[in-house]
Each structure stands twice: as structure tokens, then as C-alpha cells.
Regions:
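Aromatic-Pro/Gly-enriched surface loop or interdomain linker
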Residues: 369-470
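Mature N-terminal, pre-catalytic/accessory segment of carbohydrate-active enzymes
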Residues: 3-96, 102, 651-663, 672-677, ...
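Active-site clefts of carbohydrate-active enzymes
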Residues: 194-200, 264-266, 279-314, 352-361, ...
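Aromatic-rich peripheral "rim/lid" segments of glycoside hydrolase catalytic domains that contact
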Residues: 167, 334-395, 408-410
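Glycoside hydrolase catalytic-domain groove-lining segments
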Residues: 226-230, 235-303, 336
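Active-site mouth of glycoside hydrolases
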Residues: 38-245
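Substrate-binding cleft of secreted/luminal carbohydrate-active enzymes
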Residues: 298, 304, 311-348
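A conserved amphipathic helix/loop scaffold
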Residues: 482-743
Length: 744
């Protein structure tokens, strides 16, 4: 199931950035009743657990090859055969759709014959050792399909009080029926809400009320099973079901990264660096709400991309998101549509939807099937509890504005402490359809650049206390530094804490656009904005100091300025830089006109780095941008070097993305090769680290039947060969308490 990104549509009370200072981890809100104390599956401190042991589901969504409207076409036998093949492939879980119109064809009247079929589908899953993940109320599914209700046609089920009550009763009945099922891994409230046909009429408040009603009904009648929602594009589209709105009612959140449907964010080829970071990016963004996150759907059509390219894409997506903290994986989907289904909706209208299978319509495996098999074997082979049970190590924070989490919240206006006038923000009239995409472009490209620099980042939410991150690095790319649209920037009072953060040892990075406005900039950054920068088609920064491995005298070309000029940088101030004047900041690069372009100001134990150009938003304008030869990542490496941050174990290359997971016994380095070629790199490790072992995951390793890719013992300094599109999984143990990284 995929939602076209062109369709638009309370949060957990985390306060500010209250993570432990040592790790910078985002603390989860109190799960309360949402985490079942009894039951076959529970949530641990990071991973899901099955009967006490870490369990990472690696599975697939099953749609019968005859089409998504399966209740009218097939019975349990089709599911049984598919589950048998999944189990033989090493997959451990299957997600299925329960179509509302089939389960409840009349208001309040359940179809007992159909439910008996679903009973037998549960039995089939159990018999093959496959956990089952049922999705309720499926309405939107595959292409443009919306399976309507015959007794409530055209009514928005997320907003209509009567339909919300009906769904609560429906969920309660199913919970009572299947609460004893140990093969049921978790309830999925529905697939990709808001239902596509009702995107424009569903609000944040609707999403919250609907989620409250259905989760309450499930938990009152089945307190022993986990609950989630299979959301797609909600974080990157600013949709009403984004994790900030609903995640505190769930046991884990979900993302369905489909960058192929978001050219406004990913104007790229399938194996481009941005594309293959989409799952890790969305995982990290949703994790900022304090809930674990599953990569709950992903894939690409073999009708549009070569099957071997799709396999490389899946491998990079899965392993990089695992390094970013993902706790489960469900591919879309198990099998292609059969040719006889091509004449029927939705396939007759959406031909690409026929070819997403791990296997073709005749059950012949495609290369991506081996990727999932290898992932499943590795998840069972790794000591995830001891080496990764604490989740990802993230030394950098990219903040999420409060307005994104809770738009137009009266508490954010600062008028409740004393008598004040009846303030109403005119911004709601100026911009009734708020565009979140400039913010997401800034986040996304900042995340990719930080990944290239070996600086794993998290996305903590801004609070009303103006607290700064607990991490040693704060990355604030444009438009977070801007003004005018409150959706896109930090609160004005947030900047009052910048100097204190830096003086206590934090390193701040800012990129500026012609929209930037920070009252305290001169005091904490040692520079001031003089004017808007000239609009130029080609901006080259001449280095006057060392920057991320580049020497003084070298030139750093800012990609995207020519594209931005064509796109109208003269009128879109987010794509235009600023002219800076340095006070006490060191100038590390200048423009062709001699103006400061990159500066560094020392403040107490920390520092502030300012870039005069919105390099992240400019990179977003370049198709297939942030490629192997793009040098802008060096600015982020300057940030890392200035902070003195480094992981405990590393394969140090800007062509790799490295995620670090830690546990009580050691850690795991997940290095994914997003470059255009094979790499051979020396393994670096801190002195406290021992027991190094290396596993290479690529197409050759995945072809070995019946087992995980082999591990080999290693020592610091050993060369590690990592093929293009592959992943290196390096595990280590430690003799004493030692986190995922350190500051020198």
C-alpha cells in the first residue's frame, strides 16, 4: 500500500530535550497501559520481545495475487500456501488486510462466515511459525483503490462520531475473538490513514479522537496485545496521523518510506544516496516522539526498476534504518499480481502496482527475496539484547519545531501568565494550507550530510521550556533559522539558550538563508547578517582554514545554486544566502566577493559554526544530489571534528553511512555503502573495545542458503572490503562501561 505524496491531509508530552546527557537518547513517554504486562509480545527498552527474548520481525505484507479485494476471491488455502513459502524463506511475520466491508457488510452485523475464514488464516500462520499482523478497517489500498462501506458510503470514518463509535465496537468484537491468539504480534489499527479519499477532511484532532477510541476498545477487550498504526508519509507530509499526534497511544510507531512517490523531496534515481536514506531518515524522525519505530512497508516496482537494483535498494534501506533504530521490517509485498488481475481495478489503472513482489506471480523469487531472508537470519543470529538493547547512539540533534508537533497551540503564545489581549494568529489565514516540505527538505539533506560525516543524528522535539539538546552537537539547518512561517523555524526564545549551550561544551551548526532572523546571533555566533547575498548561478567558497579534511586554498562548490537561481531564488528567500560580517568569529571560507561564507566562533568549552548559504535546501534542488563527489559534507565533518565526537568503532569514509547501536555488553556498527563503487577501509576501534567480528552483507552472502552471512574475527587496523550496495555489520564487546562513542 502506498500513498501518493501529493495527497495532503496531543502529542506525547516530552517537554524539552530530557535525554540523558551521556548518550543523548530520547526518553520515551510513560507507556502506561499501552504496553501489555502479559502477552506473547511486549516492548522492551528498545526492541520488541517475544516471551522475554528480543524479537525483530522480518516479514512481508501479503496480498493474494488475484487482487487486494481478497475476501470475494480466495479463502484460507491461498494464505496457507503463502505462509508456508514465507517460512521456508526464513521470514517470521506476515501482515494482512481485513477489509471493513467484508468483515461488517451491514452496520453492526459481522459476517461470521468470513470471520471463520480469518480464524483459519490465523491457524495457518501458527502452523508455519509465522506471526500474524492484522490490519483493521482497510479502506485505501493499492494504487488509487478505496474500498468503501455499502452502509456509510462517502462518510469520513476518522471524523464522523457515529462511524468512530461503530469502529470502536468493531475493534472490540475482533479483540474479544482473537485475544487468545499467540500468533497475533500486534493490532494495526488501519493501513495508511487518513483514508486516501478523506485526506483533505481529516484534522489532527480527528486523528487523535479516532486513535483514542479504537485503541481504548482494543485494550479494554484485549490487554495482552500490542497496538500500532501503519502510517505512510505522515511525518514528511505533515499529515494528521504523524507520530507527534498519535504515537503516545501506541506501543510502537510505523513508517512506510516510499521516496519514489515524493519527487519534491527525492528527485533522484533509485540507488541515489538520498533515496536509500529515506527509511533511516523517517525512522529517526518518528523516533523523536519517544516511541520505537518499525519500517512497516517499503519497496519499488520491478516494472519500473531492475530487480537487482530493487534488491540493493532494499538492502541499503533496511540496514541503514536498523542502524538508525528501526525495530522491525515488513516489505511490500510477497507476490506479484497475476495477469488475470490486470483487467481489474486497481491494477488496470495502476500498472506499476502489479510488480512489487518478493516473488513473481508464479512464485519464482526475485533478488529482493534473498535480501529479506538474509536480514531475517541476521536478526536471529546477532546478540541484539547485549549489543543493541539500548538503541542507537546519536551525538547530534536536529530539532523539530514545536509548531510542527502542535500547530497553533495556545500554550505556545506566551500569553497565559498575565492578562493579555485576545490574540489570534493571522498566519492561519495567510497560509491556510501550510507547506511542510521546506522544513522536511532541510531535515532530510542535513540528515544525509551528517550521515556522510559520521555524525548520527536524532530529531528531538522542541518544548516550551526553550531547552537545548542533551547531545554534544546541535544541527540547525535552514529553514530552522528562518522567520515568517512558524511551522518552519524554532521559537524566537529558543535562541536565548544558544550561548549557554555552547559555553557548556556544545557545538552549534547553523546554515542561513535570506529568511534567517536570530536576534542573539552576534553574541553567540560572532557574526551578523548585513544583507541578502547576491543571486548567483555558481557559488564557490574559497577555504581560508582547514574544513573537514580540505585544506586552505581549496574551493568548495555549493551545489544547487544554479538550480535555485532557475527556480527563482530571487523571490524564494529560502534558497538565497546571506551576506555576513564577522566580529570575533574566525573566517574559514569566503565567497568570490570576499564576504565571510563559513565561520567558527569559540564560546567557552564549545563553538558555533555558521554557513552563509542554505546548503541543505540548495542540495534539495539538485536531482541525484549529494553524490560521491559533492564536497559539502566536509562542513559537517568540521562540526564533528570541532565537537571531538567519534564512534567507538568506525569504518571512516564519507561514502558510507554508519549507525551505532549499543547494549550492556558492547555494540554494533552498521555501515552501508551508498556509493557507486566497492570500498576497502581500515577498521578503527577504541582501546576499550575487544571481540571485534565483521559480517559482510551483499548479494553474494545472501545467496548462501539457510544461514546468516558468516562473521569473521577482526582486529583494529584490519582492512574491510565492502561492495557497492552492501552492509558491514561489526560487533564488539567491551571490558568496562563505554558508550557508542566519545568526545576527545
Amino acid at each position: 500500500m502506498r500513498m501518493n505524496s501529493r495527497q495532503k491531509g496531543g502529542r506525547p508530552e516530552l517537554g524539552g530535550y530530557h535525554a540523558p546527557a551521556e548518550s543523548g537518547r530520547i526518553a520515551a513517554p510513560d507507556a502506561g497501559e499501552s504496553n501489555p504486562a502479559e502477552g506473547p509480545y511486549t516492548m522492551g527498552r528498545h526492541f520488541m520481545r517475544r516471551k522475554g527474548a528480543v524479537y525483530v520481525p522480518v516479514g512481508v505484507h501479503y496480498v493474494p495475487r488475484s487482487g487486494p479485494d481478497w475476501p470475494w476471491r480466495v479463502d484460507e488455502a491461498e494464505f496457507d500456501a503463502a505462509f508456508a513459502r514465507m517460512a521456508a524463506s526464513g521470514l517470521t511475520s506476515a501482515r494482512i488486510d481485513l477489509l471493513w466491508a467484508a468483515v461488517e457488510p451491514e452496520r453492526g452485523g459481522m459476517d461470521e462466515d468470513h470471520l471463520a475464514v480469518v480464524d483459519r488464516i490465523f491457524d495457518a500462520a501458527r502452523s508455519h511459525g509465522v506471526s500474524l499482523h492484522p490490519t483493521l478497517f482497510v479502506g485505501g489500498e493499492v494504487g488509487d483503490a478505496y474500498w468503501d462501506l455499502p452502509w456509510a458510503s462517502g462518510v469520513n470514518p476518522h471524523a464522523d462520531p457515529g462511524l468512530i463509535e461503530a469502529q470502536a465496537r468493531h475493534a472490540a468484537a475482533l479483540a474479544r475473538r482473537w485475544r487468545g491468539r499467540e500468533e497475533l504480534i500486534a493490532w494495526d489499527l488501519t493501513d495508511e490513514p487518513p483514508f486516501w479519499i478523506h485526506c483533505a477532511t481529516t484534522t489532527d484532532a480527528d486523528a487523535r479522537r479516532w486513535t483514542d477510541a479504537v485503541t481504548t476498545a482494543l485494550r479494554e477487550n484485549d490487554p495482552g496485545h500490542l497496538v500500532t498504526i501503519g502510517t505512510a508519509s505522515q511525518e514528511v507530509d505533515g499529515g494528521p496521523f504523524r507520530a507527534d499526534v498519535v504515537a503516545d497511544r501506541l506501543d510502537f510507531a510505523c513508517v512506510h518510506p516510499y521516496p519514489i512517490y515524493s519527487p519534491e523531496l527525492y528527485p533522484d534515481r533509485l540507488l541515489s544516496r538520498r533515496m536509500t536514506h529515506s527509511a533511516a531518515f523517517e525512522t529517526a524522525l518518528a523516533r523523536g516522539t519517544g516511541r520505537p519505530v518499525m519500517v512497516h512497508e517499503f519497496g519499488a516496482s520491478s516494472a519500473q526498476f531492475a530487480p537487482e537494483a530493487v534488491a540493493d535498494y532494499d538492502r541499503l534501506m533496511c540496514w541503514s534504518s536498523f542502524g538508525a533504530g528501526a525495530v522491525g521490517f515488513y516489505a511490500w509485498c510477497w507476490i506479484d499480481a497475476e495477469p488475470g488481475a490486470y483487467r481489474r481495478a486497481p491494477y488496470v489503472r495502476m500498472p506499476h502496482e502489479t510488480q512489487f513482489g518478493l516473488v513473481d506471480a508464479d512464485s519464482r523469487p526475485r533478488p529482493r527475496a534473498a535480501v529479506l531472508t538474509g536480514l531475517a537470519h541476521a536478526m536471529q543470529d546477532l546478540d541484539l539484547d547485549g549489543l543493541a538493547g539500548d538503541g542507537p547512539w546519536c551525538p547530534a540533534s536536529i530539532p523539530v519545531p514545536y509548531e510542527y508537533s502542535r500547530p497553533y497551540d495556545r500554550a505556545s503564545y506566551g500569553l497565559d501568565d498575565a492578562p493579555a489581549g485576545p490574540y489570534v494568529p493571522s498566519e492561519a489565514a495567510w497560509e491556510p494550507e501550510r507547506d511542510v516540505k521546506p522544513l522536511v527538505r532541510g531535515w532530510l539533506n542535513s540528515y544525509v550530510l551528517a550521515s556522510r560525516a559520521g555524525l548520527p543524528a536524532q530529531f528531538p522535539r522542541e518544548g516550551l521550556d526553550d531547552a537545548w539538546p542533551a547531545t554534544p552537537v546541535a544541527l540547525l539547518p535552514a529553514p530552522l533559522t528562518s522567520t515568517t512561517s512558524s511551522l518552519l523555524h524554532m521559537r524566537t526564545s529558543f535562541w536565548q539558550g544558544a550561548l549557554d549551550y555552547a559555553e557548556r561544551g556544545g557545538v552549534i551548526y547553523l546554515s542561513c538563508s535570506a529568511e534567517t532572523a536570530i536576534p542573539e546571533l552576534a553574541s553567540f555566533a560572532g557574526v551578523e547578517i548585513v544583507d541578502r547575498a547576491p543571486v548567483e548561478g555558481d557559488v564557490r567558497l574559497m577555504l581560508t582554514g582547514a574544513v573537514g579534511g580540505m585544506d586552505p586554498g581549496q574551493t568548495l562548490t555549493v551545489a544547487g545554486t544554479e538550480a535555485a537561481a532557475r527556480a527563482g531564488a530571487a523571490t524564494d528567500l529560502h534558497l538565497r544566502g546571506v551576506q555576513l560580517r564577522a566580529a570575533d568569529a574566525q573566517v574559514l571560507a569566503v565567497t568570490s566577493r570576499g564576504a565571510p561564507a563559513l565561520t567558527l566562533a569559540r564560546r567557552g568549552k564549545g563553538a558555533v559554526i555558521v554557513c552563509a548559504y542554505p546548503i541543505e535546501l540548495l542540495a534539495a534542488e539538485v536531482p541525484d544530489g549529494l553524490g560521491d563527489d559533492d564536497p559539502v559534507w566536509a562542513i559537517y565533518r568540521l562540526v564533528r571534528d570541532t565537537a571531538g565526537v567519534r564512534p567507538a568503532v568506525d569504518l571512516d569514509s564519507s561514502l558510507l553511512t554508519r549507525g551505532i547501536l549499543t547494549g550492556e555488553a558492547g555494540g554494533i556498527l552498521v555501515a552501508t555503502n551508498h556509493s557507486a563503487g566497492d570500498l576497502t577501509l581500515p577498521l578503527r576501534a577504541d582501546a576499550e573495545v575487544n571481540g571485534l567480528r565483521v559480517r559482510i552483507v551483499d548479494s553474494a552472502a545472501e545467496e548462501r542458503p539457510g544461514a546468516a552471512a558468516p562473521q569473521a574475527a577482526a582486529t583494529a587496523g584490519d582492512d574491510v572490503h565492502l561492495p557497492r550496495g552492501g552492509a558491514a555489520i561489526v560487533t564488539w564487546k567491551r571490558a568496562a562501561a563505554h558508550g557508542g562513542g566519545r568526545r576527545s
